[in-house]
From Swiss-Prot:
SUPFAM superfamilies hit by this protein: F-box domain
Gene3D superfamilies linked to this entry: 1.20.1280.50
Ranges of residues in domain F-box: 19-70
Annotated source species: Arabidopsis thaliana (Mouse-ear cress)
Name of this protein: F-box only protein 7
Length: 395
């Protein structure tokens, strides 16, 4: 029996597609195709091939607006991680490369550092789905006698951390809640990456490309760890005594860089004002390489952010009201990011601080450093337990 007309058309179309080199399309036609894509596919288009990337650079760019990673769940661990694009008011589900019941710990450009309830860590590119699995925490940890063992009783604690004679029961809440801090850095071109995360304020684990295990150095600081940032092969550690230490990871083994640390032995001295309640402290490295200490406080019913910067002449931390004309802050991100030239809505602009802690009022918004006002983002169509800012194409 001969082929039907529909079958013949389908076969002919398939042959045309196979014989046509889509990378050699006329640039004007390709530009129109790329500019018509959804925001997510628009960012994906630049990695198709070098020809597409060359055309992509000439396209009308989308606004530099942060997206949101959102979780539709009742608990800390979610089986439904989704991506929200505010420009199109669109939610992307079923993201490639993301495991069920895993949670975002840190981000770097289009990449996320993820961990699940089994303490399996991995890095994933949300736009391409490319994934890099990291060593399991149950494996041997270099430089320490600490080890993680799965608990037989999952009520409240899923893992136990043994450190010499001590043991600490670990619940999912303790690993994934907002009190934890982590940092991710990845080079899109070379694939080099660095990961660090803090557990229980006294355990700092690091891993970089080429390592066969996690590393821990308990002698880095006697006080506890508060926050981390990473730039130019150096890990910046902000401890509970308000000191900043810098460790160089450019060699085989990390070493403290005291000579090139302008913040050495210069702790932040902050006295709370009347009625102020200090909620959290974070650090962020500017594009100039200078470190900012950011305090989030609440006074009455208002959320406020105080930013401190080192005055190198006076050798002391001073509060500032500006961070530059083209930079903004994602609270907890570790680095300042490029800001849009003008206000694009939701208060996102130079000198703004995007923050989120849970997804209910008044715990998320955009703080204007110049005016002290907070803009609330539009609510989602779904009830969400958690959300985080995501910066596609900003890296």
């Amino acid at each position: 029996m001969g082929m039907t007309t529909d079958s013949m058309k389908k076969e002919e179309t398939q042959k045309m597609s196979e014989n046509h080199d889509w990378s050699k399309l006329c640039p004007d036609i390709l530009r129109k195709i790329i500019e018509s894509l959804s925001s997510l596919d628009f960012y994906r288009a630049k990695i198709v091939c070098s020809d597409w990337y060359s055309v992509w650079k000439t396209c009308v760019k989308r606004p530099l607006r942060p997206w949101r990673i959102i979780y539709r769940a009742k608990y800390y661990i979610s089986t439904s991680l989704m991506l929200f694009d505010p420009d199109e008011d669109k939610i992307y589900k079923n993201l490639v490369g993301v495991s069920d019941e895993s949670y975002r710990l840190a981000s770097s450009g289009n990449w996320l550092l993820m961990a699940d309830s089994r303490l399996d860590f991995y890095i994933v590119n949300l736009l391409t789905g490319k994934r890099i699995n990291l060593p399991p925490m149950e494996s041997k940890i270099r430089g320490a006698q600490a080890r993680f063992v799965q608990s037989k009783y999952f009520y409240k604690s899923r893992y136990i951390c043994f450190d010499n004679c001590n043991s600490i029961r670990i619940s999912e809440k303790e690993v994934f809640e907002s009190k934890r801090a982590a940092v991710l850095w990845i080079d899109e071109r070379t694939g080099d990456y660095f990961v660090a995360w803090i557990f229980n304020k006294h355990y700092l684990f690091t891993h970089k490309k080429g390592d066969d295990s996690w590393c821990w150095n308990r002698k880095w600081t006697k006080p506890g760890y508060l926050d981390l940032a990473y730039k130019n092969n150096k890990l910046y550690i902000y401890n509970t005594d308000n000191y900043i230490k810098i460790f160089d990871f450019s060699g085989d083994y990390p070493k403290e860089d005291i000579e090139n640390n302008p913040y050495h032995n210069r702790p932040l001295q902050y006295i709370r004002g009347p009625g102020e309640v200090l909620l959290s402290k974070r650090i962020a490295i500017q594009k100039s390489g200078e470190v900012l200490i950011i305090l989030r406080v609440i006074k009455g019913y208002n959320f406020l952010f105080w930013i401190f910067k080192m005055n190198f002449e006076r050798r002391k931390w001073e509060r500032v009201d500006s961070i530059g004309d083209d930079e903004m802050i994602i609270f907890g991100h570790g680095l300042t990011v490029r800001a849009p030239v003008q206000d694009i809505g939701d208060g996102v602009k130079s000198g703004s601080i995007c923050f989120v802690e849970y997804d209910r009022q008044p715990f998320s918004g955009v703080f204007d450093l110049a005016t002290g006002k907070v803009t609330r983002p539009n609510k989602f169509r779904y009830h969400m337990s958690y959300s985080h800012w995501f910066l596609p194409g900003f890296a």
